[in-house]
């Protein structure tokens, strides 16, 4: 093979790997987080776990990606090690799907039907459809379909290019002698493992082996140990991802290694013993692409079947390899679910971000309600809790904000990108709500320390204000947690009512001050209090408006709110009237 042949082969390999990656990314985006959510929740039954592991891997076209995802689930405590074992087994079966797709390149025959099955016949059509969807369609779903079709076409073209480039090696004696050397089981396993460890994809390395079949020099005796080694080499990705993870995550990575390593040993020992007694006629024949796919599938199904009754033993072996220590019972860190491993699968990472954001929202709401209660029933311990919770919310914002920024730099779908932006905006509002909770607790502390108290009329007005603030807080956060757009639309009318309440309470206080029914000192406290209340309502409005804008693809906040409050907006006016009547202050003459 001359330099141009080598360049053609390497170029074909580059196209092959790029196509595989593009197709996998497109499939992952199209499926969204549905498969991952199922994987996360439906793994209690071993058979379900195996099927789901196979399904997810067949879709995202990478057993390594599935296993890394599982390591992340185990590391964050979402999945137990016993659940992970079945998924890992299934991932090994699912990864064989790629080799079956690639086996289409080896189809022989001159009939019209056989010609249509050849990739050279249909991949140009798929490429045309794919590029049309990518360039012309505005729908993100159609763009993802286009990416899948283009990825598949490039994958097949790369495979054909590699096969054509290596075909001249059929008459190269040096090449044949190298392949003969790999028919030695030990050397073949090592070669397959090293190749797969380097490119970190067993599907890709099996594809390369299938391309080499075009030379006619690859026999099944050579291919078998290489395929066995490829299954071992794919474990490197999971082992690397487990570095720095907790002990259970390390055990999950080792389960993947033991499954393939011990499965390879058992399979090869049995195969070579049987072959020695009853020689297989096909073993010294030239391998083809379909034969490689069959061998790859048979091994992974065989390994799953022999391990299925011994899943507990596999789990125990992992525990023996990574032992617990006496000081390993440290409390679980809730931020473990923001695992960097999930960033490789953005839809999974986004689900974890939503989970943390919900906890942050609940913490901010509880903190504010606790601080509001201090105005009527003060105690120092609750003030401490308010301050502790505010610091906790700050940590939430720091950890979650940093993770979201990392996630935002990934290749996200338009929908996921909008969700990341919404979360970044909302967590800032949650943090500010907790800050106002501290301010309110300081008002309560000042009143308690100085022995101050509001007038009876002011207490009645604040009680009504409390009710309105509690409702807008619950409405905004419940809408956020459930993604309820209709509920979010109730926030802005109530926020306007709260603005009016603040103005009216302040005006009434000025009147009482003039009549000597209230002191200037209490006026400062009241002003601080209702200002903090009104600011909290503003942040609730920000949360709801952000949700609605993301949903409606409208990003001009000022114009949106202006349109919302327009006199011809019947829905807004109707809700505003209902809230105004519900939170109406007592008659002014009676309060003076």
Predicted regions and their residues:
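Cytosolic, long alpha-helical scaffolding segments
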Residues: 79, 105, 218, 244-250, ...
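Short helix-coil transition sites and intra-membrane helix breaks within transmembrane domains
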Residues: 24-28, 57-65, 166-167, 195-204, ...
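Helix-loop-helix hairpins and the membrane-proximal interhelical loops
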Residues: 1-46, 145-194, 212-215
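Interfacial loop-to-helix junctions that mark the boundaries of transmembrane helices
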Residues: 1-7, 109-121, 175-181, 221, ...
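Hydrophobic core segments of alpha-helical transmembrane domains in multi-pass membrane transport
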Residues: 8-22, 53-57, 125-137, 150-162, ...
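Membrane-interfacial helix-loop connectors
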Residues: 69-91, 99-121, 159, 196-233, ...
